[in-house]
Amino acid sequence: MGADMGKVTWGFTCSIDGFIAGPGHDMSWMSAAEPLADGAIERMAGEVAVIISGRDGYDAAQAQRGERDELTSEAYGGAWSGTEFVLTHRPEELADAPNVTAMNCDITEAIGRALDIAGERNVQIISADIARQALEHDLIDELQVFVAPVFLGDGVRLFDVPGGRRVDWELVDTCDDSPRSFGRIYRPKRTSTGA
């Protein structure tokens, strides 16, 4: 990755018990999250050029659009604008969807195309399944973690890979504008394979 290229990030808010969405991708629990400082959401949104989402989450967001509040109905509460890739095995079904590019490809191709578009800005993954696929190929450069003070008990797990490999992370920064949300930035500890 060149010095003038953006990063591939996986950013999320999760419940204390490790869910990033409730049953049926419900996001109403996000109201329990501590609000971030003024300008924090806009700052984070400005760093992102391309969002990569999965089909299940995209469909749920569309179906729940009238039920979701401003914060959860659009990426970054509506503060973000850019390109959204939706990875799906049925891209033709989203041919008329506004503001999205539906793609039927593997994660390496999707991230490569996203990085080309992003330039110096970041590519943000907002799907647990897509992030899992990216981690399998060591494609995530940064993990952005926020925690909401709520137990969900059920829903979409943050990371659920029975038999999967261990991935170690190192803390590289804290989000000073979100101390009550436990905002933390990590990068993967990658082992060198050279001699």
What are these regions (language model features)?
Residues 1-195:
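Enzymes that bind and transform nitrogen-containing heteroaromatic metabolites
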